[in-house]
UniProtKB/Swiss-Prot annotation:
It is an enzyme of class 5 (isomerase). It comes from Mycobacterium tuberculosis (strain ATCC 25618 / H37Rv). One of its GO terms (cellular component) is plasma membrane. Pathway: Cell wall biogenesis; cell wall polysaccharide biosynthesis. Signal peptide: none annotated. It comes from the Bacteria. InterPro entries: UDP-GALP_mutase, UDP-GalPyranose_mutase_C. GO terms for molecular function: flavin adenine dinucleotide binding; UDP-galactopyranose mutase activity. Its EC number is 5.4.99.9. UDP-alpha-D-galactose binds at F157, T162, W166, Y191, N282, R292, Y328, Y366. It catalyses: UDP-alpha-D-galactose = UDP-alpha-D-galactofuranose. The keyword Cell wall biogenesis/degradation applies. Pfam families: GLF, NAD_binding_8. This is UDP-galactopyranose mutase.
Length: 399
């Protein structure tokens, strides 16, 4: 007879925010046993953070993660697992040896053009400079950007950064890649304008561990779902699967590979107390190979970090090769056509095998953390809870 401990009511593949939200809700709200399987040696997906050993400074291993949302339900939900600091994210942009206030606003415009502009004067200036190209006539990303903010600002702050991000001349990128380039006609340089913002007081990993702390949740690290599903599913034949890994990988790339961008990081401990005076500095010029530098001490000024050492991380962007970590969907027309075929496969997999697909990788969408959590709460409410509680048949939500 199958021992009770081996039986589960739900399998969750991946322990990022989507997977952990599903696991936590199903375990605590429905009193169900959940097994979370994680390929990596740690919990939390790309939100994982750890203390750098020499300094104790918390480093976001997969690039800076800033929590912000205007969704009250998400904010109330996440505060069950962590308190938040009052951190407000601000970014600066390095161009030609000068650091500019970012995003584009009165601070940047006044700095860049060498004198103060009132909101009205700045609007007029940018309208005049953008008049060079009509947005409707823009044939590529470069022309579209110039039609929105004018050539001087485009060449200083968009051209090089975009070329580095996409490894492609902006003249070769489709105009549709950008819908808007917002300019704020105020001195407000908060990066996000959401109602709620902050960083988890004890760090991301503590928050993620708290989400998985319920005794009805088991997390197995260093475990690839595709290696163990043949053993696990027969022992719990009624248990659905929530899969948050790459959508194309699930189907063994049968239709081809979806395109992603990846990031490379260089972490360095420097023998100084402060390297750049701010958490994130964008490097907008093409002659600098990285896109930005993170300095993690500035995320937590309330912490007692060493005054003689600091940790920086240089970030580089490139197209993902087969074995790279996927970060951002490229979303070309070919990708979208491929996605439609995989979505159709996902829908039939849900119907035939009780597998649901969610999260950034599982849906081929760029999701901020709060969006992944909101999406998981919706899947729980509309699909999983009705199925596990009332026996309603599973349907891939939104497919």
């Amino acid at each position: 007879m199958q021992p009770m401990t081996a039986r589960f009511d739900l399998f969750v593949v991946g322990s990022g925010f989507f997977g952990l939200t599903i696991a936590e809700r199903v375990a605590t709200q429905l009193d169900k046993r959940v097994l979370v399987l994680e390929r990596r040696p740690h919990i939390g997906g790309n939100a994982y953070s750890e203390a750098e050993p020499q300094t104790g400074i918390e480093v976001h291993k997969y690039g800076a993660h800033l929590f912000h949302t205007s969704n009250k339900r998400v904010w109330d939900y996440v505060r069950q697992f962590t308190d938040f600091t009052d951190y407000r994210h601000r970014v600066f942009a390095m161009h030609n040896g000068q650091a500019y206030q970012f995003p584009m606003g009165l601070g940047l415009v006044s700095q860049f053009f060498g004198k103060y502009f009132t909101p009205e004067q700045a609007r007029q200036l940018i309208a005049e400079q953008a008049a060079e190209i009509d947005t409707a006539d823009a044939q590529n990303l470069e022309e579209k950007a110039i039609s929105l903010i004018g050539r001087p600002l485009y060449e200083a702050f968009v051209k090089g950064y975009t070329a580095k991000q996409w490894q492609t001349d902006p003249k070769e990128l489709p105009a549709a890649n950008i819908t808007r380039l917002p300019v704020r006609y105020t001195f407000d340089n908060r990066y996000f304008s959401d109602t709620y913002e902050g960083l988890p007081t004890d760090g991301y990993t503590a928050w993620l561990q708290n989400m998985a702390a319920d005794h009805r949740i088991e997390v197995r690290l260093n475990t690839d779902w595709f290696d163990v599903r043949g053993q696990l599913r027969p022992g719990s034949p009624a248990a659905p699967v929530v899969y948050t890994g790459p959508l194309d990988r699930y189907f063994d790339y049968a239709e081809g590979r979806l395109g992603w961008r990846t990031l490379d990081f260089e972490v360095e401990v420097l023998p100084i107390g402060d390297f750049q005076g701010t958490a994130v500095m964008n490097y907008n010029d093409l002659d600098v190979p990285y896109t930005r530098i993170h300095e993690f001490r500035h995320f937590h000024p309330e912490r007692d970090y060493p005054t003689d050492k600091t940790v920086i991380m240089r970030e580089y962007s490139r197209f993902a090769e087969d074995d790279d970590e996927p970060y951002y969907p490229i979303n070309t027309e070919a990708d979208r056509a491929l996605l439609a075929t995989y979505r159709a496969r996902a829908k039939s997999e849900t119907a035939s095998s009780k597998v649901l697909f969610g999260g950034r990788l599982g849906t081929y969408q760029y999701l901020d953390m709060h969006m992944a959590i909101a999406s998981a709460l919706n899947m729980y409410d509309n699909v999983l809870a009705p199925h596990l509680r009332d026996g309603v048949p599973l349907l891939q939500d939104g497919a």
